[in-house]
Amino acid sequence: MTVQGRILQAAFWFLLIVGLTACSGGSSPIKIKGNIATSHDVNPDHAGRPSPVVVRVYQLRAPGPFLNADFFDLYDSANATLGQNLIIWEEFEFQPGETIEYNTKFDSDTKYVGVIAAYQDLENAHWRELVTLPDKKKVHLNIKLDSLTVSVSTGKR
């Protein structure tokens, strides 16, 4: 092969690699490591007995619609309520005293994490929490469900 042929071949491979890299999509996902934990007295029923609780975790681009919506709008029609601000949501059901490791990947467009808990006593519960994700590719995220309060933190335990 001539020198000119080798240069053309090298240029071809270089352009092919650059082109494939450019087509590979957006930014890499955000790695989430943490846990979701419920207290032993979570979600008391009318007699004060702890009960299972449903939790939703929302990946969001902006906080406004999440903060302004009521529980049933978020629970029954999240896509319509949150519109383009919603990236995706996940749902879990927990027994009192249950803890799981929450290791996942969030979309790189996620700027906020919203969490709601379907407490039986919504009127007296702090059922919604929102945190801003740090601008990092690895985030430690803890979600805690107490009797009538959901809390979220992005620091170490």
PLM feature spans:
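A short, solvent-exposed beta-strand micro-motif common in secreted/extracellular proteins
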Residues: T110-Q120
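Short coil-to-beta strand junction motifs in C2/discoidin
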Residues: A47-R56
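Tryptophan-paired
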Residues: A69-F106
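Extracellular beta-sheet/turn segments enriched in Thr/Pro/Gly and aliphatic residues
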Residues: S39-D41, E129-R157
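C-terminal motif of bacterial Sec signal peptides marking the signal peptidase cleavage site
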Residues: G19-A22
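Short amphipathic, basic-aromatic surface patches that mediate peripheral association
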Residues: N35-A47
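Bacterial signal peptide processing site
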Residues: S24-S27
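Bacterial N-terminal signal peptides that target proteins for export
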Residues: M1-F12
